[in-house]
Amino acid sequence: MNKKILISTGGSGGHVIPATIIYKHLEDNFDVSMTSDFRGVKFLNKDEYNLKIFNVRPISKNLLIIPLDFIFMIFLIFKSISFFRKNKIDTLISTGGYMSLPLCLGARILNIKLLLFEPNMVLGRSNKFFLSYCQKIFCYSNNIKKFPIKFKNKIKVIPALLRKNFYNKRDYNKSLDTINLLIIGGSQGAKIFDDLVKNAIIELAKNYKLKIYQQTNSINFESFKKIYEDKNIQCELFNFNDDVVNFMQKTDLCITRAGASTLAELNFTETPYLAIPLPTAKDNHQFENAHFYNKLGFNWLLNQKEIDEKTLLNKLINIIDNKEEYLVKKKNMKDFNYENTWNNINLKIISVINEN
């Protein structure tokens, strides 16, 4: 009988996308199911996954409501224990976030094997809390910030997780002769990408021929399309859930936030990028993600608090005009990617699950 694996996720795309990738890695070898809260469901095609809704509310900062949240959490822990017993789960894999708390606590109480996943270069708070209980934690590097030295032996380094369609499309032949510019604001959106970046592009288009692929909220589609077309700028707009690999294939340069999944995809497709990390990200993890790859020579990095339209415009002009530096970054990415194959990651994850 196959082992029963439960993957816990929810919240933003940064938690959900890796969970779906792990699911696909395991579904041929194990009996796999997934839990998500209501927020995470919008990033999922429910027909593809054995999915159960397990909604967890964030802990309130209101002192009057905290006791109710505590009672609700106790209820969810007992619900988790019941779920584990009923479904005879052997291993829980958590992608982090507060929505994983009751399930991880339930796994701890029942002595169920617990594996954690940390895609960021800073250890998340939920993962830190359960580090002493877990058997292993999957990371992209041994040098994770805020990681306790005494638990370093629990790190299992794997190549960055990518959706399988990225491996099927490897013809990434790009140059800056025609500038195809991709703009990715992340699953939570970004007003700076809708305003400041858009204005910089309009100025840039006065001297360069551009084709814009921009991720934005669907409510902006008509207004953005009109603005770009009025300036004779070709554009294609898309939502977060659209197949981003199709846009990366066409892209010369990307302006992006610094979520771990997005950076992994850009690195793999050898798409040099200008990273503008979300300054309000917990523990400043987006900056640390971008900084890690910046040291490897993959990207350019700007601090949102220090840029305006002119700064961004000048940076883009400098990148476009300096083709030698651009090509060096592409080569650095190519050299980095040689170990990232679907089968290699498959073997690493499965070997950890099968460890006693």
Curated annotation (Swiss-Prot):
Membrane association type: Peripheral membrane protein
Uppermost EC category: transferase
Gene Ontology MF term list: UDP-N-acetyl-D-glucosamine:N-acetylmuramoyl-L-alanyl-D-glutamyl-meso-2,6-diaminopimelyl-D-alanyl-D-alanine-diphosphoundecaprenol 4-beta-N-acetylglucosaminlytransferase activity; undecaprenyldiphospho-muramoylpentapeptide beta-N-acetylglucosaminyltransferase activity
Gene Ontology biological-process entries: carbohydrate metabolic process; cell division; cell wall organization; lipid glycosylation; peptidoglycan biosynthetic process; regulation of cell shape
Disulfide bonds: none
Keywords: Cell cycle, Cell division, Cell inner membrane, Cell membrane, Cell shape, Cell wall biogenesis/degradation, Glycosyltransferase, Membrane, Peptidoglycan synthesis, Transferase
InterPro entries tied to this protein: GlcNAc_MurG, Glyco_trans_28_C, GlycoTrans_28_N
Annotated compartments: Cell inner membrane
Taxonomy, superkingdom: Bacteria
Signal peptide: none
Catalyses which reaction(s): di-trans,octa-cis-undecaprenyl diphospho-N-acetyl-alpha-D-muramoyl-L-alanyl-D-glutamyl-meso-2,6-diaminopimeloyl-D-alanyl-D-alanine + UDP-N-acetyl-alpha-D-glucosamine = di-trans,octa-cis-undecaprenyl diphospho-[N-acetyl-alpha-D-glucosaminyl-(1->4)]-N-acetyl-alpha-D-muramoyl-L-alanyl-D-glutamyl-meso-2,6-diaminopimeloyl-D-alanyl-D-alanine + UDP + H(+)
Binding positions (UDP-N-acetyl-alpha-D-glucosamine): S12, G13, G14, N120, R163, S187, Q286
Keyword Cell division tagged: yes
Name of the molecule in the record: UDP-N-acetylglucosamine--N-acetylmuramyl-(pentapeptide) pyrophosphoryl-undecaprenol N-acetylglucosamine transferase
Organism: Pelagibacter ubique (strain HTCC1062)
Organism taxonomic ancestry: Bacteria, Pseudomonadati, Pseudomonadota, Alphaproteobacteria, Candidatus Pelagibacterales
